[in-house]
Structure formats: structure tokens, C-alpha cells
Design a protein with these regions (language model features):
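His/Asp/Glu-rich mid-to-C-terminal helical/loop segments that flank catalytic regions of hydrolases
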Residues: 20, 27, 31, 139-203
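Metal-dependent peptidase/peptidase-like ectodomains
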Residues: 7, 33-34, 43-142
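Soluble non-cytosolic domains of exported or imported proteins
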Residues: 12, 16-20, 47-51, 88-91, ...
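Alpha-helical metal-binding/catalytic segments enriched in His/Glu/Asp
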Residues: 1-50, 165
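Stable alpha-helical elements in mature extracytoplasmic
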Residues: 18-21, 25, 52-53, 93-96, ...
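Composition- and surface-driven signal marking solvent-exposed, interaction-prone regions
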Residues: 12-15, 55, 144-146, 184
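Short, histidine-centered active-site or binding-site loop motifs used for metal coordination
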Residues: 1-5, 75-77, 147
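Acidic/histidine-enriched alpha-helical segments
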Residues: 35-45, 72-73, 178-190
Length: 203
């Protein structure tokens, strides 16, 4: 999650919500055992081009080889909108999240794509990644400006969003073997190249 915002914004939705959500998940795992080591990372300068996440990946290349999954929170817990999971990894993870949503009775819209957030530098280094957000067209008009205040947020919705992310993280952190392949599929490599301006989109 990134903790920075823009100069005109209070940044409650983008991205105090993700920063607080990550803290809640850290508190959750502080109380329960888990098989895998967990690293909680708050990044700066996301709004200036993912600079914090890029710097972390640059400075921790050896550590990245041990990371099996990146979970990113960027804009959750708002009053309205649909909850999304953007998977930059193999398509099987999309299926996993869809089934988990059904199991938990939680509505989640899952896609395989590149998300414009801190998960992308990790994915570009080969780390499977998923970004969680709650978005709606009206909400996107309230970020990066003075309308991004706590008035957009819902404590009840925040708890529901974090509960689902915790349920997913629990399964990953306590898996006997991580079910997600530690490789980036070719279609995601191409999308990363396009997003990072290394290749032109043919469409």
C-alpha cells in the first residue's frame, strides 16, 4: 500500500484506506501463527510514478527471489463501488479468488491485468501480484483533488474488505505449498512491457 497522496488531496480514499487496511492485516497476523514469513511494506511516491515500490525492488533484488506473492491495497473501504481484484499472475489465481468470494459470500470482480499501483514493480520482477480496490466511476472523480476526504469512507465496508483480504492472505500464508506459480505468464509480461512503455500497444 502507498501512504502518499497529491498536494490538493487529504488522501483518505487514495490511499489512507489501503495504508490503514494493511495495518489491520498486520495486526491480524500478529495474533495468529503462519507458515510463511510475511513482510508488510508501505511505499512512498506512488503518485509520482510508483517510485517507492520501484526503489524497494531495486534495493532488495535478492529478497525478491524469496517472495512468492505480493498483495497490494489501493483504495478500499469507500461507501460505494464494486470490490475488485486485479491479478498480475497466472489465470489460476483469478479462479481461486472467484471461488473464495463465493465461499465467503463476498462479491468480488476479478481480472487478469496490470494494475496502476505498487504491485506492478514487483510483478515486473517476476513476483505474482494481486491488487485489491473498491472502485466506481463516481469515486474516481474524487481522487487527486480536494474531494478525497473521510466523507467517502465507510467503516463497515472497510471491515468487510479487510476481512476478505485477510481470508485470502490466511490461505496463502498457511498453505503447505504456495498454490501460485512463481513465474509471470507471457500475456502478463507483454502487458507489463506496454504499461512500462517498453513496448507499444498494437491495439
Amino acid at each position: 500500500a502507498h501512504y502518499d497522496s497529491t498536494s490538493l488531496s487529504q488522501g483518505a480514499y487514495d490511499n489512507m484506506s489501503g495504508s490503514v487496511g494493511l495495518l489491520g492485516i498486520a495486526e491480524h497476523f500478529a495474533r495468529i501463527p503462519h507458515r510463511y514469513g510475511l513482510r508488510f511494506i508501505w511505499c512512498g511516491s506512488e503518485e509520482r510514478g510508483l517510485l517507492g515500490a520501484k526503489a524497494y525492488c531495486r534495493d532488495h533484488e535478492e529478497d525478491l527471489k524469496k517472495i512468492v506473492l505480493n498483495i497490494n491495497l489501493d483504495m478500499i473501504g469507500c461507501i460505494m463501488g464494486k470490490f475488485i481484484a486485479c491479478v498480475t499472475a497466472e489465470e489460476k489465481l483469478c479462479n481461486y479468488l472467484n471461488y473464495l468470494g463465493l465461499e465467503k459470500g463476498f462479491s468480488v470482480s476479478v481480472s487478469q491485468d496490470v494494475y496502476s499501483s505498487d504491485s506492478t514493480p514487483f510483478a515486473d520482477k517476476g513476483v505474482p501480484a494481486v491488487s485489491f480496490a473498491r472502485i466506481a466511476p463516481p469515486n474516481t472523480g474524487t481522487i487527486h483533488n480536494s474531494y478525497d476526504t473521510v466523507a467517502l469512507m465507510s467503516g463497515e465496508q472497510m471491515v468487510k474488505d479487510i476481512d476478505f483480504i485477510c481470508a485470502f492472505a490466511d490461505r496463502m500464508a498457511n498453505a503447505v505449498r504456495c498454490p501460485i506459480a512463481r513465474e509471470m505468464p507471457d500475456n502478463m509480461k507483454e502487458k507489463l512491457d506496454i504499461y512500462l512503455n517498453r513496448k507499444r500497444d498494437k491495439k
